[in-house]
Amino acid sequence: MSKVVIRTKYSSNGKSVGGRFTNYISRRDRVDKTINARRSEVFPKYAAERPGVITMGEHGLFGQEDYVNLHKASKEIYNHNGIVWQQVISLRQTDAERLGYDTPEAWRNLLRSKQFEIASYHRIPAENMKWYAAFHKEEGHYHVHFILFNKQPGGEFLCARDYNRYKDSLTKTIFKDEMKQIYDERQSLRDKI
């Protein structure tokens, strides 16, 4: 069983989201070099429209609501004065396909089912957490770009212990059938002893 990989970074306010990311996307060989957006719009736009994204309508961005307006989401992040986390949650392609995490709907359902738990790991009151994500089918590793923040900034952070709990929680959910099979096999061996 492989594991879930989570890369996480944050910006102290929405205006700087995409600052370092701008260099990253401008160096990607498959990215349209003519992107001329405000820094705040770069990350959500990149996540929602880059090559490899699986769209759900006009773009690939999804969130807590059924429909996400990309322009409105970008403005919301730009005007946010607190911490904005930019995360990439990734699975190996073979695992994603085998376990059914090869569609945006599967990832949306996973993130929606875990949103209150994720909020608690980041020290965000559940009712104040806001998030957006986009699923990318990149060769070798399928992943979601996950943007989250506290609508009422103050007190949010992610310590190493909670990062590990967050990762373990996603791993246990994604690989639950495989884990059950392993536990059942172990129990069967114990019963034979």
Per-range role (PLM):
Residues M1-I193:
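N-terminal nicking endonuclease/strand-transfer module with a His-rich metal-binding environment
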